Amino acid sequence: TLFVVMDYIEGESLEKIVQLYGPQPEEVVIDWAKQLCMVLGYLHNQNPPIIYRDMKPANVMLKPEGTLKVIDFGIAREYKIDSLKDTTNLGTRGYAAPEQYEGKGQTDQRTDIYCLGVTVHHLLTGKYPEEYPYELIPITEFNPMLSGGLERIIMNCTQRNPENRYQNCDELLYDL
């Protein structure tokens, strides 16, 4: 008999928070993005680096004291220096970076940065990225009070070509 034991995490997923309360305030989302950047940076700095590949509000728990916990490492993988591409294409539609489903190359830390950018967009707008029109509309079109700087950060995270994104979480954290 096989038993799987998992930690109980008190709190709610960020997806549930957005469902219940709608788009979240910019200052709160920036704090959450910084926390998630530090988590991803930690994973990417392991030897070998760990690529999470499934960042989305449903996989982030908000604990009562305001800290976040990333859950569901089911499709995380080690980055393989000698590999030209991933063996399987996995990810959540709308949140997954293009390289996750096009089979063009190996996912790396820039893949997680893309997913984080989409997650931040969702938290600020309340719009699921897998809904029509299947593209990220600038956040200021949803709420003109949101900052243009944060809009540029999201756009930099979610560039189609990984070479045009932030190259690591330190760069993103600095801009946040």
For each predicted feature, which ranges?
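Conserved short submotifs of the Hanks-type protein kinase catalytic core
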Residues: T1-S13
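AlphaC helix of the protein kinase catalytic domain
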Residues: L14-Q24
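Activation segment signature within eukaryotic-like protein kinase domains
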Residues: W32-A33
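Protein kinase catalytic-loop region centered on the HRD/HxD motif
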Residues: M38-I50
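Activation-loop N-terminal segment of eukaryotic-like protein kinases
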Residues: L62-G66
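Regulatory activation segment
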Residues: L68, K80-L90
